[in-house]
């Protein structure tokens, strides 16, 4: 409903202006963004439209208070969760705000006050979701609440005017969160008999699953924003930009959220890979009973026993490393979780800011005589191609 109301308001408010001045439809993102920055919009209309669109974004990206649905959407296969919760479905709301940023920039007076709706919702989501992640025993629910918290960082950055770091965090988050979800799937497949309960069926897996463990640690460090992993160059950049733009209270919230992220991921890592094996990871499962049936088979029906052994190799071998089909994506994603931050390594200087050249929109000639200057002036025109940015 929020999306429908927001789109309708923008179309009817901007259509005449965009067609007259730019020859574009009122549904054109370029036209709407240009209209938002032109000084023409009625302040009430653009504010209500921005709020309506943001309500839609809250629902789509699982922000507070509509954050509870996302962890419940874990019933599907882990590769599906990996795609949907790292880089595709749930970031759509954040991308909507980023893509129509001039509407929010003007409508919610970003950088013009002590805070705005986007920042408040993002900050609340960061803390609440991190706290909920800390008390989960299901490893996929930990990662789901972690995703909600990271989406809160993206929203906080957009609300504070840190457009590029927020968009860059979408990029880096895709790699390390996908790796973490697939790591959880690897554990479920090869160690815990398809259980995701860390307390009941995991523990002590670091030695029997070295590849899964190593890739998990790399992605965890990226999620926690540890240098030189990719999260340092995106999430920490958001926190730094929030502080530099004068929102010190929100910067503190971001720092608290970073410590909470480290806390719940340390807990999840310890319960999964350290300590004594528990439950399925210790070899305790209903599959053990099949061995007894085999010992009572005195009539030479070895075919049934062989069929069962081939049917459930996991039970006979106990916890073990997953095959190449599972570990190869983990290794690829872990490399990207480590190195993708270098595409916009702001602390190293402007020559390292490649992502800025590729995705930051630029103004073209038409704006010179039509639009006033100011922050965000260039955000409505074409995104340059990689060739133009090279």
Ranges and model annotations:
Residues 1-349, 369, 373, 378-390:
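...captures the hydrophobic TM-helix bundle architecture rather than a specific catalytic motif
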């Amino acid at each position: 409903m929020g999306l429908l109301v927001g789109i309708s308001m923008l179309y009817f408010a901007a259509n005449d202006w965009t067609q007259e001045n730019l020859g574009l439809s009122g549904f054109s993102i370029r036209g709407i963004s240009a209209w938002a920055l032109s000084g023409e919009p009625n302040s009430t209309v653009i504010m209500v439209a921005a709020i309506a669109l943001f309500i839609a974004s809250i629902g789509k990206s699982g922000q507070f208070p509509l954050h509870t649905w996302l962890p419940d959407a874990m019933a599907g296969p882990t590769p599906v969760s990996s795609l949907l919760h790292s880089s595709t479905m749930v970031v759509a709301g954040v991308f909507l705000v980023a893509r129509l940023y001039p509407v929010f920039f003007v409508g919610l007076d970003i950088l013009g006050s002590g805070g705005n709706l986007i920042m408040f919702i993002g900050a609340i989501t960061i803390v609440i979701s991190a706290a909920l992640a800390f008390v989960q025993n299901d490893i996929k629910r930990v990662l789901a609440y972690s995703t909600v918290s990271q989406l809160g960082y993206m929203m906080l950055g957009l609300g504070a005017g840190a457009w590029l770091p927020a968009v860059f965090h979408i990029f880096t988050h895709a790699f390390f969160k996908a790796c973490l979800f697939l790591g959880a799937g690897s554990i479920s497949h090869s160690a815990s008999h398809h259980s995701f309960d860390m307390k009941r069926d995991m523990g002590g897996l670091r030695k029997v699953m070295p590849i899964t463990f190593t890739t998990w640690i790399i992605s965890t460090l990226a999620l926690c924003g540890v240098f030189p992993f990719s999260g340092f160059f995106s999430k920490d950049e958001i926190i730094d930009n929030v502080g530099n733009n004068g929102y010190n209270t929100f910067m503190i919230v971001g720092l608290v959220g970073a410590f909470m992220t480290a806390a719940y991921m340390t807990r999840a890592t310890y319960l999964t890979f350290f300590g004594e094996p528990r439950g399925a990871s210790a070899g305790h499962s209903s599959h053990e009973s099949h061995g007894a049936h085999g010992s009572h088979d005195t009539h030479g029906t070895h075919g049934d026993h062989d069929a069962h052994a081939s049917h459930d190799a996991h039970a006979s071998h106990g916890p073990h490393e997953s095959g190449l089909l599972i570990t190869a994506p983990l290794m690829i994603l872990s490399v990207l979780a480590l190195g993708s931050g270098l595409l916009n390594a702001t602390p190293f200087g402007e020559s390292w800011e490649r992502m800025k050249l590729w995705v930051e929109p630029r103004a073209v000639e038409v704006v010179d005589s039509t639009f006033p200057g100011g922050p965000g002036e260039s955000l409505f025109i074409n995104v340059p191609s990689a060739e133009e940015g090279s």
